[in-house]
From Swiss-Prot:
CDD domains per UniProt: PTH (cd00462)
Active site (record annotation): H20 (proton acceptor)
Stated name of the protein: Peptidyl-tRNA hydrolase
Class of the enzyme per the UniProt entry, highest EC level: hydrolase
Chain positions recorded as tRNA binding sites: Y15, Y67, N69, N115
Discriminates between blocked and unblocked aminoacyl-tRNA, annotated site positions: N10
A cellular component annotation (GO) from this entry: cytoplasm
Length: 189
């Protein structure tokens, strides 16, 4: 049995510190804490592996390199290769409807307008997979949504997201150890 943790984002230095890359930021924080290098190429992305818990369960950490709107291709390839059921895939991504740094876990649900999640749902053929959303806040007046998500965080929002990352990493650890319901009960803010 294996699990797949996916951080949604866009590749390249231009997007590295943008709001839309909050999923990658969280995946990187988890990988750093557990000494995993996410640098193997495959599944139209970069991935790394670790063993988790007393049973040394395989956990794959994946960053799709397809750009956000095609992320599902990468996720589906990795899930098929490792024979991972949707319930064992945790997708990490940004959410406009949550204040910066707020966390929300769900066992399943709609894409909520997030194109990366829409792609994952389309490629997996189901919306029945766990997800962890990281708040990035709504656009400031005068901003279009696309410009907002592809812009870097302002200083206050960057601080809020950075402060939330350790708790978000703990939420991922809880998902791996105890499952999505325990993680939801403990870490939804």
């Amino acid at each position: 049995m294996a699990k797949l943790i996916v951080g949604l984002g866009n590749p390249g230095p231009r997007y590295a510190a943008t709001r839309h890359n909050a999923g990658w930021m969280l995946l990187d924080a988890f990988a750093r804490k557990h000494g995993v290098a996410i640098e193997q190429r495959g599944f139209e992305g970069l991935y790394g592996e670790l063993r988790w818990g007393a049973e040394a369960e395989k956990v794959i950490l994946l960053k799709p390199l397809t750009y956000m709107n095609l992320s599902g291709r990468s996720v589906a390839q990795a899930a098929r290769f490792y024979r991972i059921a949707p319930a064992d895939i945790l997708v990490l991504f940004d959410d406009l409807d949550l204040e910066p740094g707020r966390l929300r876990l769900r066992a399943k649900g709609s894409a909520g307008g997030h194109n990366g999640v829409k792609s994952v749902i389309a490629e997996l053929g189901t919306a029945e997979f766990p997800r962890l959303r990281i708040g990035i806040g709504r656009p400031a007046p005068g901003w279009e949504v696309i410009d907002w998500v592809l812009a870097p965080f302002g200083p206050d929002d960057a601080a809020a997201v950075a402060a939330a990352l350790p708790r978000a990493v703990e939420a991922v650890e809880c998902f791996l150890t105890e499952g999505i319901l325990a993680a939801m009960n403990r870490y939804n803010t």
